[in-house]
From Swiss-Prot:
Subcellular location: Cytoplasm
Official protein name in the record: Shikimate kinase
Binding site for Mg(2+): T16
Molecular function GO labels: ATP binding; magnesium ion binding; shikimate kinase activity
One Gene Ontology cellular component annotation held by this UniProt entry: cytosol
Reactions that this protein is recorded to catalyse: shikimate + ATP = 3-phosphoshikimate + ADP + H(+)
Amino acid sequence: MLRHIVLVGMMGAGKTTVGLWLSKAKSIPFYDLDQLIEGKERATIPEIFASKGVEYFREQEREIVKQVAYSSPGIVATGGGTLLNPSNLWLLKRYGRLFYLQASLDLLWTRLKNKTDRPLLLGKEPKVILEKLLKEREVLYKQADIEIAVDGRTVEELGELLWSYWETMEKTDPR
């Protein structure tokens, strides 16, 4: 394995869940950017947002992306907003293959509506906020090498499909 498998998409799309499953199934290192930031900061994402702000979080995210990009190839679960920074997108594309886990607004809402650990959704109309974020970010997610529809698929199905795409890409375009 020469490049990272980079999972991109909205919060709630299943990046961490699919990444962990694939990591275990294929014995490949797993990097969860949000978890790495939380470990570095010794605080949860909502705590970081509340105490230090979004800009500070994005700076920490940028540093973690650099570290992971240069690490041993593995599976990388990005945060929903990781690609908002052009340098993150560039680094991740340079050192990995990007897979967009595309989930419908309805599926995302079903998964997220009762969560309290999503600071960007803490407002009067969280579903409206979620829809707005999806529309704003989708153009970035679509810069991925492959788009995989999540709705109606199990974690195992998604992992195997992703791995199949990965193997084909590595054989036909090793970069």
